[in-house]
Amino acid sequence: MTARFVARAVLIDLDGTLVDSLPDLACAANSMRADLGLPLLPVDQIASYVGKGVDVLVHRALTETMEGQAPPAAFQRGKQSFNRHYSQVNGNQSRVYPGVHQALEDLRGKAIALACVTNKPRSFTLQLLERMDLKMAFTAIVSGDDTEQKKPHGEPMLHACQLLGVAAPDATVIGDSENDVLAARAAGCQVIVVETGYNEGKSLANLGADAIVPTLLHAARLIEPRPH
């Protein structure tokens, strides 16, 4: 596969890109609904709710709509319940996608700095990365509560670049969703989308990514180090 990207750093999304975390997210969301006396939802439906952080996932899972806002009291009860359940199951059924460890090893072997950039809260991010044996691959980790704005805003990507000491145009983002593409564009980074993830149930074809590839390993093979 011919290299198409030259970078000093690669910024990688977590859920849907590195790890299939849907089983545990769905378990926690349905446990939350059960606590509030609501019927369980199909996993595929919950999959469409993933990608914009815990608060949005809770609102969507409570209202069963993409743009819904649960009443404040219900939201607070729901979020507390979700966090409690997710802290107990985070990583239990989640799985690292095939080729991810090799992709990270290949990128590090090219002396490309790596950051994980996710909308997931930091406590859950570190818990999952550690359980999946991925944490040590990353020089920097930017979670959903580390910056004022989350993806699709560009701030998390810019913060990751700052932590790695690289300019945004020298970084390539790899993610699975529109959030990642919009955040990359806002920050001034190139972006590759992988087909392993969720993207709120929408097609990847019209996102405007620089490339769409099957897996993280395919993405890693497109990237070569930028000479210093």
Language-model region placement:
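Active-site neighborhood of HAD-like aspartate-dependent phosphohydrolases
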Residues: 2-48, 54-55, 59
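Short, acidic loop-to-helix structural element flanking the phosphoryl-transfer center
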Residues: 5-7, 87-116, 122-126, 154
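Helix-loop "lid/cap" segments that line or gate small-molecule binding pockets
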Residues: 32-33, 53-70, 128, 160-161
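Metal-dependent phosphoesterase signature
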Residues: 36, 61-105
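Conserved H-loop
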Residues: 39, 110, 134-139, 167, ...
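Conserved Lys-Pro-Asp/Glu-containing loop-to-beta segment of HAD-superfamily phosphomonoesterases
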Residues: 150-181
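Acidic, Mg2+-coordinating phosphoryl-transfer loop and its flanking beta/alpha structural elements
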Residues: 172-211
